[in-house]
C-alpha cells in the first residue's frame, strides 16, 4: 500500500517515520509546501525545525507537488492530513479539488474550528459539499495519547482511529499498526474528536495549577472534574461518553496534562509564572491547540446547554479577562454539588 502525508511538521514527520519503518521503499510520501524545508530534510536526513536530532528512516519519498502527492494514491491507499486544525479546511478543500477517485482520508489535528466551533469531521463535510465533485471519500480521525518526538523514534504508543468506515480503519491499521505502535478502531468520531479538543484546554488548567504550586491534590481534582466536563459535552454532542474513558479521552488527558513534552501544559505553567500569552506563544514556536480552541469549546457547550466551569475559566484566562489565581478562587468558590 501507499501512504501520503500532507504537512511536514512534527506530526507529519513522526507518522511518516512510523509508516516508512514498515512499508516498502518509496511507498510513503511526505509533502511540504516549503521547498526549503524539503531540501533541508533531504540533505540532513531529519526535520531540524520540528524534530531535530531524529534521523528519518531510509525510503521516505519527499514531494513538493501537491497534486502529485495526492494523485499517486489508489482507492486502497491512505491520505493523512497532518496540518494543525487551522489548516484543515484549506488542505481538505485542495485535496477534494484534485482527487480523481474515492480516497481513504484521515487527519491528525485536535481541536475545533475557531469562530464556528465545528469538529474536524464537520469541517471536512462542509468542504466536501463544495469541492467533492460527486466523489464519495472515506473519512476518519487518528488520535490518542502520543508525543510526536516519542513516535518519531519508535517508542511504544497506542492510538485510536475513528470512522464510520470499517475499511478505512483497516487501511489505517495496515499503515501504522506495527512495531511499537498499536492502533485500535472506533466508530465514535464525535467522542474521539471532542476528547482530543477538550483535553488540550484541561492540560492548560493543569499546568496553571502546577505552576501556582497548588499541589497534587489540585491536579487530581482538575483532571477528574475536567474529565466529567468532557463526558457531558461528548454525550450532548451525540458521541459516546464511554469513549472518554479510553485512549482518546482520559489517556490523552493524562499525557497532555502531566507530560513535560506537552505544549499545552507549558502554556499553563508560563501563564502561572506571569508571562503574557503572546510572549508564551512566541517562545513555543509550535501550535498549542488548547489556546486556539478554548473559546470554541465554550461556545459549543453554551449552544448545547452544558456547564463546563473549568473550560469556561480557561477561556477567560486565555482571553485576558481573568488572572490565573483569580480563576482558581472562582472555581473553589462555587456552590457545593452532587458529584456527576
Curated annotation (Swiss-Prot):
Keyword Lipid biosynthesis: yes
HAMAP family, A to Z: NAD_Glyc3P_dehydrog
EC number from the UniProt entry: 1.1.1.94
Alphabetical keyword list: Cytoplasm, Lipid biosynthesis, Lipid metabolism, NAD, NADP, Nucleotide-binding, Oxidoreductase, Phospholipid biosynthesis, Phospholipid metabolism
Enzyme class, spelled out: oxidoreductase
Record's catalysed reaction(s): sn-glycerol 3-phosphate + NAD(+) = dihydroxyacetone phosphate + NADH + H(+); sn-glycerol 3-phosphate + NADP(+) = dihydroxyacetone phosphate + NADPH + H(+)
Compartment(s) where it occurs, according to its Swiss-Prot or TrEMBL record: Cytoplasm
GO BP term, example: carbohydrate metabolic process
Function: Catalyzes the reduction of the glycolytic intermediate dihydroxyacetone phosphate (DHAP) to sn-glycerol 3-phosphate (G3P), the key precursor for phospholipid synthesis.
Residues that, per the record, bind sn-glycerol 3-phosphate: 110, 144, 146, 199, 252, 262-264
Presence of the UniProt keyword Chaperone in the record: no
The protein's name: Glycerol-3-phosphate dehydrogenase [NAD(P)+]
Taxonomic placement: Bacteria, Pseudomonadati, Pseudomonadota, Betaproteobacteria, Burkholderiales
Location of the active site: 199
Family matches, as Pfam families: NAD_Gly3P_dh_C, NAD_Gly3P_dh_N
TM segment ranges: none
Organism this protein belongs to: Polynucleobacter necessarius subsp. necessarius (strain STIR1)
Gene responsible for this protein: gpsA
Gene Ontology CC, one term: cytosol
Major subcellular location class: cytoplasm
Disulfide bridge positions per record: none
Molecular-function GO terms, alphabetical: glycerol-3-phosphate dehydrogenase [NAD(P)+] activity; NAD binding
Gene3D superfamilies referenced in this protein's UniProt entry, alphabetically: N-(1-d-carboxylethyl)-l-norvaline Dehydrogenase, domain 2, NAD(P)-binding Rossmann-like Domain
Amino acid at each position: 500500500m501507499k501512504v501520503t502525508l500532507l504537512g511536514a511538521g512534527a506530526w507529519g514527520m513522526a507518522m511518516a517515520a512510523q509508516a516508512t519503518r514498515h512499508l516498502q521503499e518509496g511507498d510513503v510520501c511526505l509533502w511540504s509546501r516549503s521547498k526549503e524545508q524539503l531540501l533541508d530534510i533531504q540533505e540532513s536526513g531529519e526535520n531540524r525545525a520540528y524534530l531535530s536530532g531524529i534521523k528519518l528512516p531510509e525510503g521516505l519519498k519527499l514531494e513538493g507537488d501537491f497534486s502529485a502527492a495526492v494523485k499517486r494514491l489508489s482507492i486502497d491507499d491512505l491520505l493523512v492530513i497532518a496540518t494543525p486544525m487551522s489548516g484543515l479546511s484549506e488542505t481538505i478543500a485542495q485535496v477534494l479539488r484534485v482527487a480523481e477517485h474515492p480516497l481513504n482520508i484521515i487527519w491528525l489535528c485536535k481541536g475545533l474550528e475557531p469562530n464556528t466551533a465545528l469538529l474536524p469531521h464537520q469541517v471536512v463535510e462542509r468542504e466536501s459539499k463544495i469541492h467533492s465533485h460527486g466523489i464519495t471519500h472515506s473519512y476518519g480521525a487518528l488520535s490518542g495519547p502520543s508525543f510526536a518526538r516519542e513516535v518519531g523514534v519508535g517508542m511504544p504508543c497506542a492510538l485510536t482511529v475513528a470512522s464510520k468506515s470499517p475499511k478505512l480503519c483497516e487501511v489505517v491499521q495496515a499503515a501504522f499498526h506495527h512495531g511499537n505502535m498499536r492502533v485500535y478502531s472506533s466508530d465514535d468520531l464525535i467522542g474521539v474528536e471532542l476528547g482530543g479538543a477538550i483535553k488540550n484546554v484541561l492540560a492548560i488548567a493543569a499546568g496553571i495549577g502546577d505552576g501556582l504550586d497548588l499541589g497534587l491534590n489540585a491536579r487530581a481534582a482538575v483532571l477528574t472534574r475536567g474529565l466529567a466536563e468532557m463526558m457531558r459535552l461528548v454525550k450532548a454532542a451525540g458521541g459516546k461518553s464511554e469513549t472518554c474513558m479510553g485512549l482518546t479521552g482520559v489517556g490523552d488527558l493524562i499525557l497532555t496534562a502531566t507530560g513535560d513534552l506537552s505544549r499545552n501544559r507549558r502554556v499553563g505553567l508560563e501563564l502561572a509564572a506571569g508571562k503574557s500569552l503572546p510572549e508564551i506563544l512566541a517562545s513555543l514556536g509550535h501550535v498549542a491547540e488548547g489556546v486556539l480552541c478554548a473559546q470554541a469549546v465554550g461556545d459549543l457547550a453554551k449552544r448545547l446547554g452544558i456547564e463546563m466551569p473549568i473550560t469556561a475559566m480557561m477561556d477567560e484566562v486565555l482571553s485576558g479577562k481573568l488572572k490565573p489565581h483569580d480563576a482558581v478562587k472562582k472555581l473553589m468558590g462555587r456552590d457545593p454539588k452532587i458529584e456527576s
